[in-house]
Swiss-Prot record:
Keyword field: Amino-acid biosynthesis, Dioxygenase, Iron, Metal-binding, Methionine biosynthesis, Nickel, Oxidoreductase
Entry protein name: Acireductone dioxygenase
Taxonomic source organism: Rhodopseudomonas palustris (strain TIE-1)
Gene name of the encoded protein: mtnD
Family stated for the protein in its record: Belongs to the acireductone dioxygenase (ARD) family.
Site (May play a role in transmitting local conformational changes) location in chain: D95
SUPFAM superfamilies the record matches: RmlC-like cupins
Xref: InterPro entries: ARD (IPR004313), ARD_bac (IPR023956), RmlC-like_jellyroll (IPR014710), RmlC_Cupin_sf (IPR011051)
Cofactor note: Binds 1 Fe(2+) cation per monomer.
PANTHER family, per the entry: ACIREDUCTONE DIOXYGENASE
Catalytic activity: 1,2-dihydroxy-5-(methylsulfanyl)pent-1-en-3-one + O2 = 3-(methylsulfanyl)propanoate + CO + formate + 2 H(+); 1,2-dihydroxy-5-(methylsulfanyl)pent-1-en-3-one + O2 = 4-methylsulfanyl-2-oxobutanoate + formate + 2 H(+)
Amino acid sequence: MATLLFDDGREATAAEIEAIARAHRIVVEHRPVPAALAETLARPLLDDTAAATVLDALPPRPEFPSRDLIVLHPERPDNEQLATKFENWHRHAGDEIRHILDGAGIFGVIVDGQRADLHVGPGDFIVVPAGLEHNFRLTAARRIKAVRYLSDAEGWSAEFTGRAA
């Protein structure tokens, strides 16, 4: 289940996470990863066939007609380049929706002027609403597999804010 840590090291309670999420229109839910995907998700990298298998095992969401699977792993040649890109603070015109299937990551958000880190792992489903400044960082393991949902193609474009990572 997702955890929220503030810059001062304090961990938010479940009630605080719910209140903060509601106030900032962030959705944080737990949606179990289908057990049938365990063997496929255990692979470090996935080819197109394996990625399609993963996507086919998850129910489509009509409100998000487009989706793909992002796989970051140390064995991926451009892993650090992609990870660094996501670390830059940015916002989107559309919602950023992720369902974490394997690995872990950290969504940084600004909550009432204070930076907070939302740690996500397998089964966590998060929606960062359009316009909310955020970033994303990998954990020390440097790996994650997540479905990215999109309601419109323009939503993928990031507007970088220049805030220091």
